[in-house]
Amino acid sequence: MFRRLLIATVVGILAVFAVAGFRHAMLLLEWLFLNNDSGSLVNAATNLSSWRRLLTPALGGLAAGLLLMGWQKFTQQRPHAPTDYMEALQTDGQFDYAASLVKSLASLLVVTSGSAIGREGAMILLAALAASCFAQRFTPRQEWKLWIACGAAAGMAAAYRAPLAGSLFIAEVLFGTMMLASLGPVIISAIVAWLVSNLINHSDALLYNVQLSVTVQARDYALIISTGVLAGLCGPLLLTLMNACHRGFVSLKLAPPWQLALGGLIVGLLSLFTPAVWGNGYSTVQSFLTAPPLLMIIAGIFLCKLCAVLASSGSGAPGGVFTPTLFIGLAIGMLYGRSLGLWFPDGEEITLLLGLTGMATLLAATTHAPIMSTLMICEMTGEYQLLPGLLIACVIASVISRTLHRDSIYRQHTAQHS
C-alpha cells in the first residue's frame, strides 16, 4: 500500500509538469504568432485586424491537419494503440506514444490559433502519457490502467484546480473500468498535482472569481432544480448537434488538413461578429461571472460560440470539449436567469446563481457524472453553499439526459475521433 501511495505521489508530480509544459508552450506560441502575452485568446482576437482574425484559426487547422496526415503517411499506418486516455483505460492500458504526442502537438496548434476547443483535453492526455511511461518502466502490467487513471485525474486537478472533481471524474465517467478500492491512489495523485501546481504558480487562487452574495432559500432551490430540468433537455440536444456536425464534415470527404481548415475558417468568420468565439471559453466565462451581460448580448455571444464549438469539434480539431461545455451551460443558465429576472427584484443575483447552476447541470447532462459536475463547479468557484442544490439539480439533469441520449459527450467524442 505504501508503494502505491509513493507511486501516486510521483505520478501527480509528473502530471503537473506535463500540464505546465503544454501551458507554457501555448503561451509561447501565442506570443510569437499573435503578439499576445495576456494569456487570453479573446484579447488576442480583439487586437488583431479583421483579415488575421478570419484566417488565423483556418491556418492553425490547416497546419494541424497537415501534421496529422503527414505523420500517418510517414508511419504508413494508423495508431497501433490508443491515443486517448479513455481508450487506454478501456483496453489494455497502453498508448501509441508517438502518435499521442503528435496528436497533442496538433491540439497545441489548433488551440493557440483560436479554435473553439478545449486545451485541457491535451493537458490531461499528456499527464496520462507521463504516468503511463513511468508505469511501464517501474510497475507490473496489471497496474498500468490504475496509473493512467491517476495521471488523468492529476492532470485534471492541475488544469482545473479541482482535485476532488478530478478524482470523481475517473470514478464516475469511467465507472466499471476500475475497482473502488483503487480510488485511493487516484485521489492522492490529484491532490499532489493540485498542491504542486499551486507551488509552481505561487498561487492557490480559484479558477473563476465569483461574487455571489445571495443566501440560497426555498425559491432559489426551486429555480436551481428547474435549471437542472432545462439542462437535462439541452444536454442531449447539444450532443445530437455535435454528432450531426461531425457527420456533416465527414460527408464532405475532405482531406484532414482541409477539413480542419474549414472548421477554423468558420470560427474565423464568427469571430468577425464577436472575438469571444476564440478559444475554449475561459475568458468569456470569467467576464460573464464578473458582470453578467444583458439578455440580447448573452444570446448573441451564445449563438456564435455554440456554432464555433460545433464547427471546431465537428471538423475533428484535436482537443477537449469540457471547458466549451461549461460556457454553453453558463450561457443557458444566464439566459434563463435573465428571463426570470424580469419578475424578481434581485434579477442580477438570480442570473449569476442560475449561470453557475447551468455550468454544473449541463456538464452533468453531457458527461452523465452528476457528483463530479457538482464538485467541479464548487471547487472552481469556491461557492460551496450551492452544493446541496447543485447536487439535486445535477442528478435530475443527468437522469433526464441519460434517458434521452445513451452516450455521454466523452464516449461520443472518443468514438468520433478514434
Swiss-Prot record:
Presence of the UniProt keyword DNA repair in the record: no
Keyword Membrane among UniProt keywords: yes
Transmembrane spans: 5-25, 54-74, 146-166, 173-193, 222-242, 258-278, 291-311, 316-336, 352-372, 380-400
Localisation per UniProt entry: Cell inner membrane
GO MF annotations in UniProt: voltage-gated chloride channel activity
Gene3D superfamilies reported in the protein's UniProt record: Clc chloride channel
Main function: Probably acts as an electrical shunt for an outwardly-directed proton pump that is linked to amino acid decarboxylation, as part of the extreme acid resistance (XAR) response.
Record-stated family: Belongs to the chloride channel (TC 2.A.49) family. ClcB subfamily.
Name of the molecule in the record: Voltage-gated ClC-type chloride channel ClcB
Species assigned in the record: Shigella flexneri
Organism placement in taxonomy: Bacteria, Pseudomonadati, Pseudomonadota, Gammaproteobacteria, Enterobacterales
